[in-house]
């Protein structure tokens, strides 16, 4: 999931670069104000994505799996610890998905304001954020079969679907504002 977070962070960084370019579609006070708002939000998304790279949940899972299993009570404690560690490990890709989805929403806002000359960077940024989202989603979906709590799995699957819809809409909005990428 670290690679997905790095991809999303790179996409956010590119968008941030575009947001602070001196040339815009319409050099108005309103546009400049909106660009500052978008840049501030992108900076936050980028930093949060970088923080997820440093989140290490594997240690908790390894520790839980190495707990003693001699008695029924120990096996029960071990299973509970494993499930708790799995939830913690599922939260990281879910957060990467949320942040990449937010980055894509900001890309759509930025696409309406940025200069046409930045469209190549915008397309690449959108692709990187989409790759980050897809990588985190794949990582998370691979973990779902390990959960015992069906209601938790259902809530995660519902959030995956919601974020996927949000991401698709934001990517389409950005692409429609940018036009077809150069061949």
Regions found by a protein language model. Give the residues of each.
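C-terminal auxiliary extensions adjacent to catalytic cores
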Residues: 136-147, 154-183
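Long, C-terminal-biased catalytic regions of enzyme "large/alpha" subunits
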Residues: 36-41, 61, 127, 134, ...
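Inter-helical turn/loop segments and adjacent helix faces that build the functional surface
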Residues: 22-25, 29, 110-119, 143-155
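A structural-propensity feature for long, helix-poor, extended segments
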Residues: 25-68
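Disorder-to-helix initiation segments
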Residues: 3, 27-38, 75-82, 149, ...
